[in-house]
Amino acid sequence: MFDFNDSMVSNAIIKVVGVGGGGGNAVQHMCEEVSDVEFFALNTDGQALSKSKVQNILQIGTNLTKGLGAGANPEIGKRAATEDRAKIEQLLEGADMVFITAGMGGGTGTGGAPVVAEVAKEMGILTVAVVTKPFPFEGPRRMKAAEQGIDELTKHVDSIITVPNEKLLSVLGKGASLIDAFNAANDVLGNAVKGVSELITKPGLINVDFADVRAVMTNMGLAMMGMGEASGENRAREAAEAAISSPLLEDINLDGAKGVIVNITAGMDMSIGEFEEVGEVIRSFISDEAIVIAGTVIDPDMSDSMKVTVVVTGIEKVAMKRGFGVEKTSSLQQSASSFSNKTSAPFLRKETEVVTGASNAPKTDSDDVNKSDIPSFLRRR
């Protein structure tokens, strides 16, 4: 069954804060690609901030570092952010949702990002972190610092999406330049922020608004964001599969996932059958008890293609890494059979009039849900 909820359209204020050098670079990259959100770069390094093209900048810990960086010391980054908690609070004032992005493993981002998150949560803001883990060539010491920083950050956010840079090497190949590798990392961070923020800010025929995002991301822990695009006769299924594959994001286990937001973008030719087909793919990999919220956006420029954005929250890390070489055909047959024999997860649909402007943010409540056995999460080749 679908729940139909009429809603008015209003603004939800979204702020994206890049902490440290990696976070600042990512935000600078994003501000050229993502609209309808406010961007901020926060750093101890005054020289790095002076070169930033981000409109809003904040230098922290000037009494501590004298305008220099944190020297790859997370403790310095933490103390610098703590020194300027009041300024950070002022920066976050008025936000409904905050994305915190950082390259973990260094000093300012690793130590400062958890402080920013803590302040945001204390202010009652929906707080989501999107961070990278170091490349293997950056060494075990940096990786250890990153892991410790991520553990600390996780304590203070509603949801966290982690991007291991090592995955980029397998996708890009060893012949890729260093610049290409870091640009690719920025692309992944940007797509994660864009994928979630556009769910809120871009009006749709069937609308996903801030209240939906809040219900699925509040106090949910580990999250995954995936985007897939396909064209042709099987575009709905193929785009949905690509979205949940997410080869660049952290290996995760969808068993017991508590919430899913699905956004489907296509042209005027999108059918209700395609809408349901995307739902089949998504529901076949999650618990019957998970909250599934779906929305659509009609883009007249997409004549033959379809894009599916999926945000999955309340998931668990995989103890051992899974390969991507799973045969997809057999998994689809199993999924189709499984789906036809079980009750669909709650599939909540928001219907709104298509207008320009941001989406509505009425309050909705979501109950805690229990984990249950479901088909294993299968990766595409």
Swiss-Prot record:
Please give the InterPro entries that the UniProt record associates with this protein.
Answer: Cell_div_FtsZ (IPR000158), Cell_div_FtsZ_CS (IPR020805), FtsZ/CetZ (IPR045061), FtsZ_C (IPR024757), Tub_FtsZ_C (IPR008280), Tubulin/FtsZ-like_C (IPR037103), Tubulin/FtsZ_2-layer-sand-dom (IPR018316), Tubulin/FtsZ_GTPase_sf (IPR036525)
Which locations, inside or outside the cell, does it occupy? Cytoplasm
Task: Quote the protein name from its UniProt record.
Answer: Cell division protein FtsZ
Q: Which residues bind GTP?
A: G21, G22, G23, G24, N25, G107, T108, G109, E138, R142, N186
Alphabetically list the UniProt keywords: Cell cycle, Cell division, Cytoplasm, GTP-binding, Nucleotide-binding, Septation
Q: Which SMART domains match?
A: Tubulin, Tubulin_C
Where are the residues of the annotated region Disordered? 353-381
Q: What domain of life does the UniProt record list for this protein's source?
A: Bacteria
Its assembly, as annotated, is: Homodimer. Polymerizes to form a dynamic ring structure in a strictly GTP-dependent manner. Interacts directly with several other division proteins.
GO molecular function (one):
GTPase activity
Any one annotated GO CC term: cytoplasm
Q: In its UniProt record, which GO terms are filed under biological process?
A: division septum assembly; FtsZ-dependent cytokinesis; protein polymerization
The main location class comes to cytoplasm
Q: What does this protein do?
A: Essential cell division protein that forms a contractile ring structure (Z ring) at the future cell division site. The regulation of the ring assembly controls the timing and the location of cell division. One of the functions of the FtsZ ring is to recruit other cell division proteins to the septum to produce a new cell wall between the dividing cells. Binds GTP and shows GTPase activity.
